[in-house]
Amino acid sequence: MSTIKSGDIDKGSFLLFKGMPHIVLEREFSKMGRGGSIVRLKLKNLKNKSVIKETLKGSDTVEEIEVLEVNSQYLYKDNESLIFMDLETYDQFSVNLRDVVNLEDKVLFLQEAEVYSLIKWGNEVIDLKLPPKVAFEVIDAEIAVKGDTVTNAMKNVTLHTGLVVKAPLFINIGDKILVNSETKEYAERVKV
């Protein structure tokens, strides 16, 4: 672990704050007149998922935790765990859904046999990185009604992982679409 000045903290940094690992969700830097600078942080506790707001002076220091990014292949979901394979050792390991922040939200984006980046702190997985856009096959789509195109009309489509998103009327069953993994919104149709 190393200490860094609060002015050097970036969004997405991993910090040890009050003895617990946190990720920086938001960061705002303010330069005061003669009083120096302050940094406002929004932190998410990686253990209990609580979100706190902290204000630090620009000269304050905090502990930055050393994390390791490991590429692992997603194999399958087993009750409350996700099973991955380490690509270097070929060992299989499980990650409990309740142990990782926002993992429940990311499960519907995981596809078997795909490789994902897991963020580890020591031997513990603390985060999972998704690509910005993920390709899915549409398995169910509402029927588009002719004449619904006065505005930017959208309909619900169900993807092969169970995720339901709004998509344009021209999307049909069997189409492949890209979905933004951060906003869970339709991005574009995959060209064949």
UniProtKB/Swiss-Prot annotation:
InterPro entries in the record: Elong-fact-P_C (IPR015365), NA-bd_OB-fold (IPR012340), Rib_uL2_dom2 (IPR014722), Transl_elong_fac_P/YeiP (IPR020599), Transl_elong_KOW-like (IPR013185), Transl_elong_P/YeiP_cen (IPR001059), Transl_elongation_fac_P (IPR011768), Translation_prot_SH3-like_sf (IPR008991)
Coiled-coil stretches noted in the UniProt entry, renumbered to this chain: none
Swiss-Prot/TrEMBL keywords: Cytoplasm, Elongation factor, Protein biosynthesis
Any one GO cellular component localisation term in the record: cytoplasm
Record Pfam families: EFP (PF01132), EFP_N (PF08207), Elong-fact-P_C (PF09285)
Pathway where it operates: Protein biosynthesis; polypeptide chain elongation
GO molecular function, a single term: translation elongation factor activity
UniProt xrefs under SUPFAM superfamilies: Nucleic acid-binding proteins (SSF50249), Translation proteins SH3-like domain (SSF50104)
Keyword flag Protein biosynthesis: yes
Primary location: cytoplasm
GO biological process: peptide biosynthetic process
Keyword Cytoplasm: yes
Subcellular location: Cytoplasm
Recorded family membership: Belongs to the elongation factor P family.
Functional note: Involved in peptide bond synthesis. Stimulates efficient translation and peptide-bond synthesis on native or reconstituted 70S ribosomes in vitro. Probably functions indirectly by altering the affinity of the ribosome for aminoacyl-tRNA, thus increasing their reactivity as acceptors for peptidyl transferase.
Protein name: Elongation factor P
Gene encoding the protein: efp
